[in-house]
Amino acid sequence: MTTPAQTATAAAQTRSGNADYAWAKFDSEAYFQHYYGDPHPDDDRVIKCAAEAVKRIPGAGQDLDIVDVGTGPNLIPFFCMLPRARRLTAWEYAHSNVAWLEAELLRDDLRPQWQHFWDVTRTAYGPQWSLPETPVELIKSKCNVTRGSVFDLPQGRWDAATMFFCAESITERLDEFEAAVQAFAKCVKPGGTLVAAFLVRSGGYEVSGRRFPVLHLTAEAIEAVFARHTSGVESERIGIVEAEIRSGYSGFVFLTGTAR
């Protein structure tokens, strides 16, 4: 007789995993245009939450070695962490996203969308931080891109880490999601700060007609997994609705914690 646990395991194994998708064919520019071409208030909320978390990191000054995991075609994580960063690394797997990020970091100007998000960042930090009107020079001097899988993150390397909408958007398997969260939590030195956001009840997403995976998760399930691998967890649920606002998005949970 098959036990419930065996049934659950078999069901999980039939779901698509990270390796089943053509990440090399990910259309980075199409993704950017769809998700960031028209800034949404919830994106601004991510920045405000992240800025508050970063401001609370112990120690003054721009002295942290920080990684963003699964960056994708997105500069928002850089903006959030720049004021406290000595060095910022985008840890990204897809070749297309790596090339897109490298080109974006070399630009001498900001796209209007990025300028909007930087303006939100400056406001979130406040005038006492004296942030410049454009982050272009800060980005060029502090940011770099490393190609790598979330599952291959080195342990205990960074002072702080961010991960926005990555672990749940690379697989349909719960075991792989938890492995990604665990790798994220362990990449920071003990006592370091972890800042993350996860999609809630996402139904999946397409980029240029090609479908990519999302794990359909409740806020409670996300919080439980995150708490298994971090300490001092704080959670805020943002914009969660029944119907998707845009494909693959119906709200998120924002989490902070401390690496063990």
Residue ranges and their predicted role:
Residues 196-198:
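Acidic carboxylate diad motif detector
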Residues 175-190:
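A short glycine-rich, Lys/Arg-flanked "PGG" loop and its adjoining helix->strand segment in the class I
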Residues 94:
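Conserved SAM/SAH-binding beta-strand->alpha-helix loop
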Residues 106-152:
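S-adenosyl-L-methionine
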Residues 159-175:
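A short SAM/SAH-binding and catalytic strip from SAM-dependent methyltransferases
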Residues 73-86:
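Conserved SAM-binding loop of SAM-dependent methyltransferases across substrates and taxa
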Residues 202-224, 245:
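Acceptor-substrate binding/catalytic loop of class I
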